[in-house]
Amino acid sequence: MSRRGLFAFALAAALLCGCGTMRSLVGMDPKPVSPDWKGLTLRAADDANSNSAIAVDVVLVKDATMLDALTNMPAAKWFATRAELQRTFPEALTVYPYELVPNQTIKLTDKKWNGQKAWAALVFAGYANAGEHRARLLLNNAGYVVLLNAQGFSASELKPGAPQ
C-alpha cells in the first residue's frame, strides 16, 4: 500500500472511531479545571425558606461518573446521602457546607477553592418544601450570587466589575 493510501486509510479509521478518540489522541479530552470565580456570594432573603435557617452546600465534583449521578439528584436526597457519598468517594467531591438564616449574606473569595480542580460545581439548598433546589455553576464564569428566597433559589452570574 502506498503512503498516500496508508494515510487515507488511517484518516478514515480515525474518523470512524469518533471525535472522542481523536481528541484523546491529541490530548484535547476535557479535563477538570479550577473555578475562575473571583467570588461567590450566598444571600438569604428576609423570608428565605419560609423564615427558617437553610443549609446550603457548594459542591465541587471531581469525578465525571459522580457528576452524572449528582446532576439530577434533588437536594433532599443530596442532604440525606451526603455523608455516605463523602465516606465512600472521598476523592470525588469537595463540599463547602453553610447554613444561612434569613437576611444573612456570606461572601466567599477565590482563596476558598484555590488549587481545587473539578468537572463541575453544584449548589444544593435544603428547603423545607419539595423541589429540586439544585443548580449547576459554570466554572469559567467570574463568579455567582446565589439568592435564597422563600421557596427556592436562583444563581446569577457575577458580571466583572459589578458589585456583589
Pin down the residues of each PLM region:
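Bacterial N-terminal signal peptides that target proteins for export
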Residues: 1-9
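N-terminal Sec signal peptide cleavage junction
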Residues: 19-21
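Glycine-rich, aromatic-bearing surface loops/beta-hairpins
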Residues: 23, 129-164
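Extracytoplasmic
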Residues: 35-37, 51-55, 91-93, 116-118, ...
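Early exported N-terminus immediately downstream of N-terminal targeting peptides
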Residues: 39-76
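Tryptophan-paired
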Residues: 73-114
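A short, solvent-exposed beta-strand micro-motif common in secreted/extracellular proteins
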Residues: 117-128
